[in-house]
Amino acid sequence: MALRLITRFRGLNIPQRSLHQSTFRLNETIQSTTTTTTTTTTTTTSDEIPTTKPRFQSRFRRNQQPHQQQRSPYTSSQVTENLNIGEINRVRTVPTLMTYYGGNPVHEDNMNRLRAVLKKYQQLPVRVVPDREIQSQKFIGFDDYLEKTQSGTRVKKIHYRELITLLNRLRTIDLELMPLEVSEILSEYTSKSVSKIVQLSREKTLDCFGRAKTQAKRKSSIAKIYLVKGEGEVLVNGKSLIEFFPNIYARKNLLYPFQVVEQEGKYNVFAQVTGGGYTGQSEAIMYAIAKALVVFNPLLKPRLSKAGLMKSDTRIVERKKPGKVKARKSPTWVKR
């Protein structure tokens, strides 16, 4: 059998493959594969891949073909380049509330708004809210607040009490200096079903001539005045102060508000007064002057209030009773 094979392949030249040649070929293939893998990781295009043996090159192309099919034809940079900033903002979803990811977003947003406004106007002077105003202007109830927030069972009564506490603190700001922003917030949370008995006095301003117009009462006297900055001239019913009030105590009463604020001789007063005697007329003008000074400078109100000039004296003369000589005086007792 061996002789037949030798005679059959005698005319052929079969090269012998030595061991050192096979190891050299193996090392060469290992180096070529390592270079191809490093180039594929560091580059992005297939044109920069180094040349290798045909069989390894075909295998490399066969392995890379599925990855190229999965890759998107448009990169992220190409997509953003085709859109402007306005379109990107429309595509991006942004929550409407800053507290969207909280447990109670609507209520927390309301509380943050009230705290910011309270911190902004914390330096303004405060007042004592009268009971009549509290009864006439009530805030919305718990059920109305639930309907307003649309948060269901997330809003508890303790949350509602925290809200009312902040609203009451905002309501204590002086009416003469209350900002429009605070007034809008208070009206937003005020109950519409409660009838407004008290009409809140708005801040008075100067007229086109720079005058402050006010009026006041004392006993049966009614005084209307115009106050303007000047040299300290006072006219009462068209007459000078000394001519109309010969009594020195009446003149002191009239000028007392200027002494409280240390503004003597800096304003002109034009007054019209009717009814009563010189005491009632002079004090009626005094209260009217105090109100006019607040129009010029609202910060003077605490000093004038402390002096008792912002609230008129409501005492009047007691009437005469039957069987009495005067209001309480009885006639002289005579035995016979």
Swiss-Prot record:
It is found in: Mitochondrion. Residues 32-81 are annotated as: Disordered. Residues 33-45 have a biased composition (Low complexity). It comes from the Eukaryota. The keyword Iron does not apply. One of its GO terms (biological process) is translation. Its main location: mitochondrion. Keywords: Mitochondrion, Ribonucleoprotein, Ribosomal protein, Transit peptide. Gene3D superfamilies: 3.30.230.10. GO terms for molecular function: RNA binding; structural constituent of ribosome. The keyword Signal does not apply. Residues 65-81 have a biased composition (Polar residues). It holds the Pfam family Ribosomal_S9. PANTHER family: RIBOSOMAL PROTEIN S9, SMALL RIBOSOMAL SUBUNIT PROTEIN US9M. Component of the mitochondrial ribosome (mitoribosome), a dedicated translation machinery responsible for the synthesis of mitochondrial genome-encoded proteins, including at least some of the essential transmembrane subunits of the mitochondrial respiratory chain. The mitoribosomes are attached to the mitochondrial inner membrane and translation products are cotranslationally integrated into the membrane. Component of the mitochondrial small ribosomal subunit (mt-SSU). Belongs to the universal ribosomal protein uS9 family. NCBIfam families: PRK00132.1. This is Small ribosomal subunit protein uS9m. It comes from Candida albicans (strain SC5314 / ATCC MYA-2876) (Yeast). The gene is MRPS9.
